[in-house]
Amino acid sequence: MKKAILIVSFGTTYTETRIKNITAIKNQVSMLYPDTIIEEAVSSRIVRNHMKQDEHIDAKSPLEALMSLKEQGVTGVVVFPTHVIDGIENNQMKNAVEQCRTFFEKIVTADALLSNVDDYTDVSKALWESLKEIAGDSPLIFMGHGTEHSADESYMIIEQALRAYARHPVYIATVEGKRTIQDVIRQMKDEGTVSYTHLRAHETL
């Protein structure tokens, strides 16, 4: 069986961020599976268009990447999403997998990062242990992408899990979800965590 791993990310328009995160993941997977074809796909159409226009990079969609693997004679595929939640992008990826299922002898898909109760606990522990020294006594705010999908509730759940584990004022705001940074600022004022609206980013995640 000719095998491949397809790494699917939302993508980013920031080259440095892409190299530090998405490319780093690909490199690590390549080291672990040196005899396996490693393919990449970008699930966001907007990001793909930006990469093509500004960087002259023809990033593949999940469907295009799967078709490419078929043309290469691949018969077994592991689809590895880096999506945090099982929202719109992850579901579109899964739809692409279903469209191509008959093209391969075997194709399996990993879950998004936050898919079950244990995931929230594990991610909360990892985040807090890596950032508690930076946070110190200050409240810690995470910014997520957010979505209109019902999976947007995942951000509230991970906030609750973080607070329970860290015993620290932790907040999660989103760019496109229900809970905005303005909502978080109001909550911080109500809780007496902060009396001003000037926020300083310690680290970009």
Language-model-detected regions and their locations in the chain:
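Extended amphipathic ligand-handling, pore-lining, and cofactor/metal-binding catalytic surfaces
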Residues: 1-196
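Flexible, D/E/H-enriched segments
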Residues: 199
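Single conserved hydrophobic/aromatic residue that forms the stacking wall/gate
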Residues: 202-205
